[in-house]
Amino acid sequence: MYRSACDCDLYGSISDQTFLGYAKEIEKKFGVVWKDVVTRTTGLTITQSGLPITAYFFSSSGGKTELAINAWGSGRTYTQIVDDPGSLDLTLNPRFVSWSRDVPQSVIAAAFILPDVVSLEILGTNESGTVAQIQATSSSGVQVVLRGETFRSRTKIPSAWFSLVSVQN
C-alpha cells in the first residue's frame, strides 16, 4: 500500500521490520549512521541480470544468514549463507543473541492444525542452523510436519533458529 505521507510502500509492523523513519533519524546513538547510509544509497537499485531483485531484510540472523528457499520457500540465486557475527554480539543485539519463549500448547496445536500436541520433534536443520522441519504428534497419533519458518510464523517466536527445551501438557 502506498503512503503519501512518507512516499513509501512500507508498513510499520513486522512485515517491514517496523519502518521508523524520522524517529530513527533523530536517535542519538545510531541516527547519524542510519541517515548517512540512507543518504548514500538513495536512488540505488540492486539488480540481477538488469532486473530489480527482492531485497530481503532481517534484524538478527542467529550468526548466519539464510537462503531464501529456507526462509520464504522460493530460491533466489543472490541469497547465500554468510557469517553474521554482529547477530551474536550481546552489545549490538541484546534481545536476540539468546532468547527463550514459552509457547502454550494450544498455540502449538493450532500451528499444526491439530486438536492437541503430545510431542514435538525437530526432524532436521538447514545449513545455516535454522530448523528445516519440525513434526508434531497428537494424542490420537496423527503426525504433521511443518517447515521451521512456517512454525516460527504461526507461533510468533522470533526466529527459526531454535531448539526444544521441554514440552508440557
Predicted regions and their residues:
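Conserved, single-site charged/polar hotspot
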Residues: 1-169
